[in-house]
């Protein structure tokens, strides 16, 4: 006979408390069929899906990780960094299913060592341009807000990052048809009521504008105000006629549908793409940073950094304040090849980034570090770079923008880690002693030096001719 064991009130409280429970698992990133590496089981995921746990060294030696049961020492004490991810607290075998969490745990530590903030993405893809947009933090007070009133939700659409509706440009044809059938079509009646409110507001605004113009012609100081029209006063024929007029105004129609369904901003297509999408030709450009790639699936910072700015100075103990931040070493993962789309790929703090662009040192012709792969280099080829910007794209992946580091900054960084082979400003010049050439003393010179002063070879006193008297 099966029976259920009773749980104490304290145990039930701990089980239901969010403070003493692991957060739910985040869905994994969608796989791309064109990139088979994302389908491999050994590949590192784009972002962590499980909570990473750590413990003290004294507790790890006992297998105590703060869980329901201790973890085996053989698989947890052999690693340098104590980090695990719990997949399942109680499996079918009544054990705790866990795996190593150093993949994302060390990546987080490496990224936080860079001390750079997360910025909103920009549409400028060429960092070598002279004009660079000002980096805007994702934690600004006017953008890092999710609770909006209905009016603010419409006014702040260009600054928001969270929407209840989808991003239409990122949907497949099948997903779009399913969205129309299950979400849009059942809301026809609600949309007509929404249009009634818009018509009532427009009629009220037009009436007030007419009253103000009439008062201005009469010379009245104060104009009368029209009582707001009620949405119930708008007939179905007016709604139908208004919808017919909207068919010829793509921008107004898209704005109203986007406000009603709370759709993410959509960037208009380019001139070449506009021919295939004739309905999107007249759409105006959006100022939203997520119009081109879509809003992020998480918070724009992804929880990887909470810094708001990089406006600080590094103070060197010997050389004083530095103009730029310390550079970091990057590993060349893929050398540069000739042709479009074959740029070099480098690894920075656990992330893959594009190589420095423009006329930089690493792009000079004949630079063997970026041009070819040399397997004889221990640990792989490396170069020093500066991390200029970090963003999180719509799929939750961290994108880094790097540039070549200055030679002086590289020497200072090498000196701090004891790898500088030569002084930064060169060795101090040695003090040059004033030397005199020694001339050998001959017998004649000795006789002339010690010659008797009573019989000089030349007169010791000048005559009157020496003073110009003769």
Curated annotation (Swiss-Prot):
GO terms for molecular function: structural constituent of ribosome. It comes from the Eukaryota. Pfam families: Mit_ribos_Mrp51. The keyword DNA-binding does not apply. GO terms for cellular component: mitochondrial small ribosomal subunit. One of its GO terms (biological process) is mitochondrial translational initiation. InterPro entries: Rbsml_bS1m-like. Residues 453-464 have a biased composition (Low complexity). Keywords: Mitochondrion. Residues 436-470 are annotated as: Disordered. It is found in: Mitochondrion. Component of the mitochondrial small ribosomal subunit (mt-SSU). Mature N.crassa 74S mitochondrial ribosomes consist of a small (37S) and a large (54S) subunit. The 37S small subunit contains a 16S ribosomal RNA (16S mt-rRNA) and 32 different proteins. The 54S large subunit contains a 23S rRNA (23S mt-rRNA) and 42 different proteins. Belongs to the bacterial ribosomal protein bS1 family. Component of the mitochondrial ribosome (mitoribosome), a dedicated translation machinery responsible for the synthesis of mitochondrial genome-encoded proteins, including at least some of the essential transmembrane subunits of the mitochondrial respiratory chain. The mitoribosomes are attached to the mitochondrial inner membrane and translation products are cotranslationally integrated into the membrane. This is Small ribosomal subunit protein bS1m. It comes from Neurospora crassa (strain ATCC 24698 / 74-OR23-1A / CBS 708.71 / DSM 1257 / FGSC 987). The gene is mrp51.
């Amino acid at each position: 006979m099966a029976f259920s064991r009773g749980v104490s009130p304290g145990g039930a409280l701990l089980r239901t408390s969010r403070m003493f429970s692991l957060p739910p698992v985040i869905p994994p990133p969608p796989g791309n069929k064109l990139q088979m590496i994302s389908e491999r089981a050994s590949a590192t995921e784009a972002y962590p899906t499980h909570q990473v746990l750590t413990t003290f060294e004294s507790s790890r030696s006992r297998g105590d990780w703060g869980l329901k049961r201790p973890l085996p020492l053989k698989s947890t004490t052999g690693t340098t960094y104590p980090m695990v991810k719990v997949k399942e607290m109680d499996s079918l075998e009544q054990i705790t299913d866990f795996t190593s969490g150093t993949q994302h745990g060390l990546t987080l530590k490496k990224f936080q060592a860079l001390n750079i903030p997360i910025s909103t993405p920009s549409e400028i893809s060429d960092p070598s341009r002279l004009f660079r947009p000002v980096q805007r933090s994702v934690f600004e007070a006017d953008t890092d807000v999710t609770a909006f009133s209905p009016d603010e939700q419409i006014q702040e659409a260009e600054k928001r990052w969270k929407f209840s509706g989808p991003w239409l440009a990122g949907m497949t044809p099948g997903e779009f048809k399913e969205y129309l059938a299950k979400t849009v079509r059942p809301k026809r009646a609600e949309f007509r009521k929404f249009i009634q409110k818009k018509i009532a507001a427009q009629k009220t605004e037009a009436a007030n504008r007419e009253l103000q113009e009439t008062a201005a012609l009469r010379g009245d100081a104060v104009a009368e105000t029209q009582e707001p029209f009620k949405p119930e006063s708008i007939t179905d024929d007016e709604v139908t006629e208004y919808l017919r007029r909207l068919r010829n105004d793509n921008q107004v129609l898209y704005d109203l549908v986007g406000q009603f369904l709370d759709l993410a901003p959509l960037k208009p297509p380019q001139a070449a793409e506009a021919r295939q999408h004739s309905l999107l030709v007249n759409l105006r450009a959006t100022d939203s940073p997520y119009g081109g790639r879509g809003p992020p699936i998480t918070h724009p910072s992804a929880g990887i950094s909470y810094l708001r700015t990089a406006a600080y100075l590094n103070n060197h103990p010997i050389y004083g304040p530095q103009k730029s931040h310390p550079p970091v070493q990057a590993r060349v993962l893929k050398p540069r090849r000739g042709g479009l789309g074959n740029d070099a790929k480098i690894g920075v703090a656990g992330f893959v980034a594009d190589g420095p662009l423009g006329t930089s040192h690493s792009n000079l012709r004949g630079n063997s570090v970026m041009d070819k792969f040399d397997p004889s280099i221990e640990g792989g080829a490396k170069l020093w770079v500066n991390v200029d910007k970090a963003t999180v794209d719509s799929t939750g992946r961290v994108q880094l923008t790097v540039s070549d580091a200055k030679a002086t900054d590289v020497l200072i960084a090498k000196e701090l880690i004891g790898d500088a082979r030569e002084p930064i400003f060169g060795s101090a010049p040695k003090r040059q002693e004033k030397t005199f050439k020694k001339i050998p003393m001959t017998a004649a010179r000795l006789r002339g030096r010690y010659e008797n002063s009573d019989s000089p070879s030349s007169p010791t006193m000048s005559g009157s001719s020496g003073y110009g008297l003769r």
